[in-house]
Amino acid sequence: MSKLIELNGTYNLRDLGGISKQVKDNVLFRSDRLSELCENDIVKLKSLGIKRIIDLRSVGEIESHKDKYIEGIENIALPISLAFTMDELNAMDENGVLMVLEKANEELITKHYKVLEKFLNLLLDPIPTIFHCTSGKDRTGFATLLIYHILGISIEDIMLDYMNSNDYLKPRLEEQFTKMNIDIKFKPLMFVEERYINKAINVAKEKYGSIDNFISDKLNFKQEKRDKLRQNYLLSKY
C-alpha cells in the first residue's frame, strides 16, 4: 500500500510508491491540503525532492486555505468544484449527504474529465509531485485510481489503498468532530466508503464500457501516453 509520510501539518500525505511492489518510491505523493505546513514540514518536503504540487480543490477552497508557498516548488491549480454548497448541505438529512457524496464521484466522470485529462498529461513529465484536495480522499482518491489503473495495479489493491484513507483520517477528524460539535449527519463527509468511488467506476462503465475506455476515449490518454506513464513510474522490471 502507499506509505504515510508524517508531517505536523498533514494527516493523509502518502507516497504512491511500493504498492504491489511495482511503483517507484519518492516520485508521486497524494495528500490532504497543504495550508497548515510548518517550517519543519517544508524542510522535509524539500528533502523528498518535491518540485511540483497539483491542487485539485475548488477555487473557494483554495482561496480560504491557500497552500503554503514553498520556494522552488511549482504549484498548479486544477480546480474540481464541489457537488454542493454549504447551504444545500445544511438542508440535507444523512441520506442526502450520502447521496451527494455519490454525486460528487459521478461528476468526476460526467463533469470534470477535462481536469483529469490535464492532470494525467502533467504526469508525463516525471518530476516529484504531490497532488491533493482537502482531505486527500475523494478527488485525490479517484486521481490515484486512474494512475494505478494505468500502471497495471489490481483493482483489489487499488480499493485497499483507497480505504486506507480512513486509517489516517479517523483519529484526526473524529477529534475535530467532537470538539466542534458537528451534526452527526455530516460524519460521512469525513471518511470514504467503497460505494463512493464505485459510483464513479460504474458511471464510467455505463457510459464508456470500462474505466480503461474512459481513460482512452474521454481523457484522450492513448497507449503511447500510457506507456510513457508506465516508464516514468514503474520499477524497471515491470
Give each language-model segment a name.
Residues 1-130, 143-238:
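Cys-dependent protein tyrosine phosphatase-like superfamily
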